[in-house]
């Protein structure tokens, strides 16, 4: 255990050393005038020498001069122009001075001896601005929409003949329910269902009236399994066929599944026949076809009607209306997945050196344990 701790400590020291080394490796030390001599008659004019070099932040200048008889002062531009030695920003007088250029912009240096300054012993150094590497533009990911999983719907119940309505012809005694809707996912219809009247049907023999249970809320753009052009009552209670002033169930306003341009369940991929008294599809658990709507236990289903034997005579009694269970049943909406936040990569020398140091440390540790 102690050997592992020693190895980890040694690796940390190596990492810190490499990070420090690489962080200061880019800094340069410049000898003023080429040889560092801070004198009145340099071999090359100080400003000419400065123009030939490129100074960056954290670089340094080395001044060498006679201690006690000369000095180096960092001053403002106005004091530089007038050789004012009484208001220095920094004053160096130890004979050998190293001045760090800790910012970008212009640095003004003059001799602390005013007579030397007036003879040209002054220097202007311009430090280049720090250039941050442009970061790559962050591309925000397109939010993906996860598909909703609709519940598997059972076939609608076999309908009973609608309540007696004023008609001009006798409704048939038997009717066959259309094929059950497919078990595929599709959006829920949200339009109210009303049974328009005075429309002729192309199905002369087998009209399928509304089922006994609440109208199935199938997740498909198809209309109700009943042969009416009404859409599935997803949010509003549908009117009973007893109130439809249509001529007869045979002449219901709906189109036949075989001839109607509407998206009838007869055109769905599923061809299993509907069985009587099977639970109707909905987003929530289906109720028994003989029981009333789950939200209105004391009222019958909105489309339940008497048997075919009572459809011969006109009736004025209306079937009590109850809201469809889909009004209170939450539907599955599209779920939007959160988008990951974009990452902006900024390259810095310290990060690169840290990675390199980590690699060196890992290699060293591996070699020690190997």
UniProtKB/Swiss-Prot annotation:
S-S bonds:
83-117
Amino acid composition bias (Pro residues), ranges on this chain: 291-305
- Which species does the entry assign this protein to? Arabidopsis thaliana (Mouse-ear cress)
Keyword list (alphabetical) reads:
Cell membrane, Disulfide bond, Glycoprotein, GPI-anchor, Lipoprotein, Membrane, Signal
Q: Which family does it belong to?
A: Belongs to the early nodulin-like (ENODL) family.
Q: Name one Pfam family in it.
A: Cu_bind_like
The membrane topology of this protein is: Lipid-anchor; GPI-anchor
User: Where would you find this protein in the cell?
Assistant: Cell membrane
Protein name per its UniProtKB record:
Early nodulin-like protein 1
Lineage of this protein's species?
Eukaryota, Viridiplantae, Streptophyta, Embryophyta, Tracheophyta
Q: What is the reported tissue distribution?
A: Mostly expressed in stems, leaves and flowers, and, to a lower extent, in seedlings, roots and seeds.
Q: Where does the Phytocyanin domain start and stop, copy by copy?
A: 28-129
Q: Where is this region: Disordered?
A: 135-347
Q: What's an example GO cellular component term for this entry?
A: side of membrane
Q: Where is the composition biased (Low complexity)?
A: 135-175, 195-205, 215-290, 306-318
């Amino acid at each position: 255990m102690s050997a592992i701790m020693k190895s980890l400590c040694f690796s940390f020291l190596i990492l810190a050393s490499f990070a420090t080394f690489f962080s200061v490796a880019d800094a340069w030390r410049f000898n003023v005038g080429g040889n560092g001599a801070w004198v009145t008659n340099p071999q090359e004019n100080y400003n000419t020498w400065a123009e030939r070099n490129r100074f960056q932040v954290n670089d340094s200048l080395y001044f060498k001069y006679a201690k006690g008889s000369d000095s180096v002062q960092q001053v403002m531009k106005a004091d530089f122009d007038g050789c004012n030695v009484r208001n220095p920003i920094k004053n160096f007088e130890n004979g050998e001075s190293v001045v760090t250029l800790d910012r970008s912009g212009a640095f003004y240096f003059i001799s602390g001896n005013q007579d030397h300054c007036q003879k040209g012993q002054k220097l202007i150094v311009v430090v280049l601005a720090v250039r941050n590497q442009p970061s790559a533009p962050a591309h925000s990911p397109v939010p993906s929409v996860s598909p909703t999983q609709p519940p598997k719907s059972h076939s609608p119940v076999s309908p009973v003949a609608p309540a007696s309505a004023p008609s001009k012809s006798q409704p048939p005694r038997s009717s066959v329910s259309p094929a059950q809707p497919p078990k595929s996912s599709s959006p829920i219809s949200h339009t109210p269902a009303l049974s328009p009247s005075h429309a002729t049907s192309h199905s002369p023999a087998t009209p399928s009236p509304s089922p006994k249970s609440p109208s199935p809320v199938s997740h498909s753009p198809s209309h109700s399994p009943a042969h009416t052009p009404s859409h599935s009552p997803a949010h509003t209670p549908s009117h009973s066929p007893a109130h439809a002033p249509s001529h007869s169930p045979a002449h219901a306003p709906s189109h036949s599944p075989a001839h109607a341009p509407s998206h009838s369940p007869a055109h769905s991929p599923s061809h299993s026949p509907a069985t009587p008294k099977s639970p109707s599809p909905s987003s929530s658990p289906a109720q028994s076809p003989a029981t009333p709507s789950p939200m209105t236990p004391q009222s019958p289903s909105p489309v339940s009607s008497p048997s075919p034997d009572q459809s011969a005579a006109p009736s004025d009694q209306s079937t009590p209306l109850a809201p469809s269970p889909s009004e209170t049943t939450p539907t599955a909406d599209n779920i939007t997945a959160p988008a990951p936040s974009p990452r902006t990569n900024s390259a810095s020398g310290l990060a690169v050196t840290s990675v390199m140091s980590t690699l060196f440390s890992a290699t060293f540790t591996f070699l020690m344990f190997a």
